[in-house]
Design a protein with these regions (language model features):
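Short, acidic/small-residue loops that bind anionic groups at enzyme active sites
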Residues: 150-164, 280-285
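ADP-ribose/adenylate-binding Rossmann-like module
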Residues: 131-134, 256-310
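General beta-strand structural signal in soluble alpha/beta enzymes
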Residues: 105, 131-134, 155-158, 189, ...
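Adenosine-phosphate binding glycine-rich loop
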Residues: 158, 282-390
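A short, aliphatic-rich alpha-helical micro-motif
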Residues: 124, 182, 250-251, 271-274
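Glycine-rich phosphate/diphosphate-binding loop of Rossmann-like nucleotide-binding domains
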Residues: 74, 81-99, 157, 161, ...
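N-terminal ligand-binding/catalytic initiation module
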Residues: 1-155, 381, 385-389
Length: 390
């Protein structure tokens, strides 16, 4: 039995990976009158007078919705909301297991940006935060932007920002090994979708100066015209030397390759054309842009992938539970760049100087101390940047 067959049996036996459980026992009339009528009227009156007290009298403070329309699910693509539900259930239990955040899945039977936004806004009073998941680009950018403008609770598209945070944390540690500075790097980001865009913007916020973003047609540059406005935006904030050409052209003399694209598109010759002590994060799944052994044999110093069976897995589970834990604990109104960079530092710092080596730049997912570090770093950054409300 392979992993897929075993997982199918696992899911069939469970009939759902999460459930609603009560935090109180109702064993007599007094319990009933406290938890429900008539006593429940008093917290209702208090919340009506002061809406902020909902954080004291309900579970809003610790509740996150994992919201998807099922248009970009894993490597499966647009499989629709119902078929995406097992993924959203899985995400929800990771929130609970790793950071004690009460998360529940909501899948929406619409692809319309405005319908999704309006639906989420209408259910937001229940929530302390919103995790957007597996929504296709470029719609995901617009949905997140509109929700952030209209809501005063954290809205976080994990496929974008969770991936970007782990990439940055890995790069922080990789740079210690190769003894290079971020501002001196030539970085190639291959893939201009949700993850590639977020990675690029976070690296720029961190201090990178020379990033070239490639899509299937080559480097985004200011000599080209794009129908996708997000490509135009990327071309205006990256590629300072306005290089053009295919990936094989612009990767020459690069220090870092970050792939969120397609399998087997990086050759050994391309790696050899990069600068010495190159760093490659080849994150296409299940087949990376180049396999680690091939990259290493071609001269790469540090290699990461999206797979657990190779060293240095770029795994979002290291980020999103602790990020929401920290944001919820200080009732942050958003998750900003300062909080993301703080999370990346916390993850990177979870690998000690003694442990750090080319095959270990990112901590293991089951090191639960990482989530505590991330939560604390995010809390501190939220307070310092002025988005914490308690």
């Amino acid at each position: 039995m392979n992993i897929y067959e075993e997982s199918l049996q696992f899911h069939k036996q469970l009939r759902g990976k999460l459930e609603v459980s009560s935090r109180v026992k109702i064993t007599n009339e007094k319990d009933l009158s406290l938890a429900y009528t008539p006593g429940v009227a008093e917290p209702c009156r208090e919340i009506h007078k002061d809406p902020s007290t909902a954080y004291h009298y309900t579970r809003k403070w610790n509740t996150v919705a994992v919201i998807s329309d099922g248009t970009a699910v894993l490597g499966l693509g647009d499989i629709g909301p119902l078929a995406s539900l097992p993924v959203m259930e899985g995400k929800s239990i990771l929130f609970k297991e790793f950071a004690d955040v009460d998360a529940f899945p909501i899948v929406l039977d619409t692809k319309d940006v405005n319908e999704i936004v309006e639906t989420v806004v209408r259910i937001a009073p229940t929530l302390g935060g919103i995790n957007l998941e597996d929504i296709s680009a470029p719609r995901c950018f617009e949905i997140e932007k509109k929700l952030k403008e209209r809501l005063n609770i954290p809205v976080f598209h994990d496929d974008q920002h969770g991936t970007a945070i782990i990439v940055l944390s890995g790069l922080m540690n990789a740079l210690k090994i190769v003894n290079k500075k971020v501002e001196d790097l030539k970085i190639i980001v291959n893939g201009a979708g949700s993850a590639g865009t977020a990675i690029t913007k976070l690296l720029l916020s961190y201090g990178a100066k020379n990033i070239i973003v490639c899509d299937r047609d080559g480097a985004l540059n200011r000599n080209s015209t794009y129908s996708n406005p997000y490509f135009t935006e990327l071309s205006n904030i990256t590629n300072p030397n306005n290089e053009s050409g295919l990936l094989c052209d612009v990767i020459k003399n690069a220090d870092v390759f970050i792939g969120v694209s397609a399998p087997n598109i990086v050759s050994k010759e391309m790696v050899t054309s990069m600068n010495s002590d190159s760093i490659l994060f080849a994150m296409a799944n299940p087949t990376p842009e180049i396999f680690p052994d091939d990259a290493k044999n071609a001269g790469a110093k540090v290699i990461g992938t999206g797979r657990s069976d190779f060293p240095n897995q770029i795994n979002n589970v290291l980020a999103f539970p602790g990020i929401f834990r920290g944001a919820l604990d200080v009732r942050a109104t958003e998750i900003n760049e300062e909080m993301k960079i703080a999370a990346a530092h916390a993850i990177a710092d979870s690998v000690s100087d003694e442990e750090l080596n080319p095959n270990y730049i990112i901590p293991k997912a089951f090191n639960l101390d990482v989530q505590k570090r991330v939560a604390q770093a995010v809390k501190d950054a939220a307070i310092k940047s002025g988005v914490a409300t308690i």
